[in-house]
Amino acid sequence: MVRKFDFLVIGSGIAGMSFALKVAHKGTVALICKAGLEEANTYFAQGGIASVTNLAVDNFDKHIEDTMIAGDWISDRAAVEKVVRNAPGQISELIKWGVNFDKKDNGEFDLHKEGGHSEFRILHHKDNTGAEIQESLIEAVKQHPNITVFTNFFAVEIITQHHLGIIVTRYTPGIKCYGAYVLNENTGEVDTFLSKVTIMATGGCEAVYRNTTNPLVATGDGIAMVYRAKGAVKDMEFIQSHPTALYHPGDRPCFLITEAMRGYGGVLRTMDGKEFMQKYDPRLSLAPRDIVARAIDNEMKQRGDEHVYLDVTHKDPEETKKHFPNIYKKCLSIGIDITKDYIPVAPAAHYLCGGIKVDLDGQSSIRRLYAIGECSCTGLHGGNRLASNSLIEAVVYADAAAKHALSVLERYDFNEDIPEWNDEGTISNEERVLITQSMKEVNQIMESYVGIVRSNTRLTRAWNRLDILYEETEKLFKSSKATRELCELRNMINVGYLITRQAMERKESRGLHYTIDYPHPQK
């Protein structure tokens, strides 16, 4: 089946839905989501969204400086300034769409402070800010007559000149995107979505790791599709681990214990109750995430422990319950009362700082294709993301991409020559064990060899193991009917390869990339 829309948005988190809402008054929008509208990373973001609002003590320059320091000075300053200066306007837009940020009794925003921030500037809704934003955007999207939502539709490949029989390489100038081939899981058929403009908003790829705070839909689909289409992908080695995921064996994804809990006064302790952050950083438990994650990883490896503890037992119990109701409830469900007991925590893959390379308008290296949100690499985060900068980046770049796309829309038309998906000669694969086992292998490879601390030996081993899986999976893909699981496995292997290759290419330790073979940053 062929479907035509002015805008094809792949992904239904804060980036994709914001973009859809910003362009829908000017054209038809298809919003593709591989599961339900709630199954986005945005929904799981607890901490908040960073924006300079209290001008009595805070200003743009401070937020810019904090972001540059966290990014280990390799952030793109133009991208940093763009996000920071445009943040307040986008906060107003979110409020207009129905997002409720917590306020104090005097009507001012109740701002949090998180690791790496010099001032209180994190707007939040209790400890489930992402869910509040996601639910508000879902309501706005559902009410818009020009937006059609496709749930359980999985994008398999973006369509370029390659599908017209033209040879496309990484050096081909002017590659264009004409839409995407999308698997309709309701029918099992691959539909052709033709568009004037396509927006990749598919989120991160942390489900390639065994321990992750991300929903298991975060398989790097958009990044893999763009890479296969010969688009530019950048900074994939910078995978941020959240230092404090709840340690509860069997949970996947891991439950996230927000950064704000350390900002609130939480203290990290070893399993025998000793504080340890003084050995690593003068900011103690409020040091940036990469330092805290490496410190925890080091303590665990040195001592042979499975986790460390986060302690808020010295804080007022009622205040703790009020600030962190979801964390209190989750921990209580597994027998931990956080007002009396230490919380067992360990690092887990949390956020990708790299992704599809884009310019200040969110344009990728492929024409007519934009990338926004976590799947993109704007240059904002550099070597490490400052806490709560991701949600604001998503809306600022959704706004920039929307403005640019609207300004060029009339130049484009649908390409009617695109052939429909051809799966003649393929068979339905009943051997799901081949796919699930290979997924487990990817998780194990990435966790063991491409984790928080890396080495040339580990990365080479990961490369060799992934290469075997790649050959097996491509063979399976060519002979089988497309299924979501098979496509996800293929994407996970592509993304695992990109993380590993770009980690091998960086001959230094910087930001989130730490290797024992090159322990210092290059000058």
Show where each model-derived region lies.
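Short beta-strand to alpha-helix junction loop
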Residues: S75-P88, R121-E139, F150, T212-G220, ...
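Rossmann-like flavin
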Residues: A70-D110
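FAD-site-proximal beta/loop scaffold in flavoenzymes
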Residues: E157-T172, Y178-T187, I336-L380
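Glycine- and aromatic-enriched mobile tails/lids
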Residues: M1-D6, K22, T28, G36-E38, ...
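Conserved redox-cofactor binding core of oxidoreductases
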Residues: K96-E189, L194, A201, A245-H248
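Conserved N-terminal glycine-rich FAD pyrophosphate-binding loop of Rossmann-like flavoproteins
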Residues: A35-M68, D72, Q240-P243, D251-F255
